[in-house]
A protein has these predicted regions:
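Hydrophobic/aromatic residues within well-ordered alpha-helical segments
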Residues: 21-24
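A short, surface-exposed loop/turn module that caps and links secondary-structure elements
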Residues: 30-56
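Residues in soluble alpha-helical coiled-coils and helical-bundle/repeat scaffolds
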Residues: 16-19, 37
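Enriched for short, Lys/Arg-rich terminal
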Residues: 8, 12, 16, 27, ...
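Conserved N-terminal entry element of GNAT/NAT acetyltransferase domains
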Residues: 1-8
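Acidic/histidine-enriched, beta-strand-rich ligand/metal-binding domains
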Residues: 3, 13, 46-47
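A generic structural signal for beta-strand entry/edge sites
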Residues: 1, 51-53, 71-73
Length: 89
């Protein structure tokens, strides 16, 4: 079982979203935390090899995250609409 941590940017992103989307995102993050191999449920981004980044789709939003396999932590970096999710990461 993994622990989900959100950085300050991701916390701020959640505050800017509609409540029903926030509920769906939280449900998805909880489901990822319950998985024994959450990296199988997300898409690995190709341009980040030194620290692998993953993308998780929830409706029109994308959750950009990293997974620390050793410490069993899912660290959420940002949550944005799909049109702007991959900028500045």
């Amino acid at each position: 079982m993994f622990t989900v941590l959100l950085n300050k940017r991701a916390q701020k992103d959640l505050l800017d979203l509609p409540k029903n989307d926030v509920r769906r995102i939280r449900t998805t993050l909880n489901e990822l935390a319950q998985e024994t191999e959450p990296w199988l449920l997300v898409k690995k981004l190709q341009s980040h090899e030194e620290v692998p980044l993953y993308s998780c789709q929830v409706g029109h939003y994308r959750i950009i995250l990293t997974i620390d396999h050793g410490h069993l932590i899912i660290f959420v970096i940002t949550i944005h609409h799909r049109h702007s999710a991959y900028r500045n990461i």
